[in-house]
Amino acid sequence: LQERNPEIVLDPMCGSGTFIIEALMILTDRAPGLVRRFGFNGWHGHDRELWLSLKAEAAERHEKALEQPLPKFYAYDADWEAVKATRENIIAAGFEKLLGDIQIEERTLADWPDFGAENKTAFIVTNPPYGERLGDKASNRSLY
């Protein structure tokens, strides 16, 4: 994703926002464990100073990456509850400051806006509904 340097990142069936959050983490160089607590912190053989040094280095890389221009993010879903969950999960993941760079909307696949994406590099990723989320045959005709 970083090597492709997309101008647009789109998830047209964003569900709870996992792919958008992962893309944000990749493009802002945020280490996956940066905001987590780990059990090894209580281990007697744990080198606390080394761990804090590594975390500080990772945090510095993340802050530096946040200063760089990011693509425009689009997170769409036909289900309002999914849209709401995406917004909440982006905030919970620590990316509240970037909400202005993410268009999160209730939209169907047939209702895409004009992104002005002509001659732009776009990264499109999604996880289409399956299993219980799939729905009935009639409602899926337009999806598949």
Segments the model singles out, each with a brief description of its role:
Residues 69-70, 118-120:
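Short loop/turn elements that form and flank the Walker-type P-loop nucleotide-binding site
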Residues 120-127:
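Short SAM/SAH-binding signature in class I
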Residues 130-133:
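A short, flexible beta-alpha/helix-coil linker loop
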Residues 1-111:
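Conserved S-adenosyl-L-methionine
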